[in-house]
Amino acid sequence: MQQADLTKRINELKLKRNAVILSHYYSRPEVQDIADFVGDSLALSQEAVRQDADVIVFCGVHFMGESAAILSPNKTVLLPEIDATCPMADMVNVEGLKILKEKHPEAPVVSYVNSSAAIKAESYICCTSANAVEVVNSLDADEVIFVPDKNLAAYVASRTDKKIIPWEGHCPTHHQILREDVLKMKEKHPRAEFIAHPECRPDVLELADHVASTRGMIVHAERSPAKEFIIGTECGLIHGLLKAVPEKTYYCVSEFACCPSMKMVNLEKVLTSLEKMQQRVIVPEDVRARAKEALDRMLAVKIN
């Protein structure tokens, strides 16, 4: 089926099912284009709550669909590709986290939303890359357990007086962005600003002109006087940047900055998901209720 035909059929089924399509910035360009809303993890969590649709088709990885199901239990949440998992989310397990909590009983657990529902249920509060610093600083505690991303934990630690106890996880896509990659791109494009995601290695962030979440990068590109940008995150964001600020030029920092899991969803899978109402994301109620408390606490934190 041609792309135009796929798009037409998807739109027809959206109306029939009273469905809405949500997509992360890292999805394929054509998937972002068919979506009703494209955003970062924080915005997508908020949008899942705001939408009055009966069905949410979540074009992203598994933890994103889980978050939508946690926050919107009365809606049917579908993942077009059930095998699209987040490697970083899989790096932390409940048993290990419980042991860490026993070692630090006074430390609340902050879980990055890039984690499973089960991990969120073991956490006091969640965070995204857009609000991690504000979330940690909102806590009445001297030390904080931060899971699963050690790089984001290091970034937060540099911006708080609290002791951060990190889990040893990381995003493989961002972790593959090396300092040498940045230096080469800076030499090739000396007038370009380097904007980086806080999931990058600390020595990469040292070279950044600006550090931000994916949505924060778009906002920065809109406001900055710079005309060129080296983008230190997953390459899919460039599509969103070009749509938001088309008059500027963007360079992906590395050819390896591509998340295979986020690229698994295509238009054919979105269509099949709507046709067959699959794959539905189910979160057990006991887990969902506890995870929702952590997400609700996050959503209540005001960010600058």
From Swiss-Prot:
Residues annotated to bind [4Fe-4S] cluster: C86, C171, C259
Name of the protein: Quinolinate synthase
Catalysed reactions, as listed in the record: iminosuccinate + dihydroxyacetone phosphate = quinolinate + phosphate + 2 H2O + H(+)
Pathway assigned in UniProt: Cofactor biosynthesis; NAD(+) biosynthesis; quinolinate from iminoaspartate: step 1/1
UniProt remark on cofactor binding: Binds 1 [4Fe-4S] cluster per subunit.
UniProt-annotated binding residues for iminosuccinate: H24, S41, Y112, V113, N114, S129, H197, P198, E199, T214
Locations listed in the record: Cytoplasm
Any one GO MF annotation of this record: quinolinate synthetase A activity
Co-factor(s): [4Fe-4S] cluster
GO cellular component: a single term: cytoplasm
Domain of life: Archaea
Function: Catalyzes the condensation of iminoaspartate with dihydroxyacetone phosphate to form quinolinate.
Pfam family, one: NadA
UniProt keywords, alphabetically: 4Fe-4S, Cytoplasm, Iron, Iron-sulfur, Metal-binding, Pyridine nucleotide biosynthesis, Transferase
Disulfide bond entries: none
EC number of this enzyme: 2.5.1.72
Similarity comment: family membership: Belongs to the quinolinate synthase family. Type 2 subfamily.
Gene Ontology annotations of biological process type: 'de novo' NAD biosynthetic process from L-aspartate
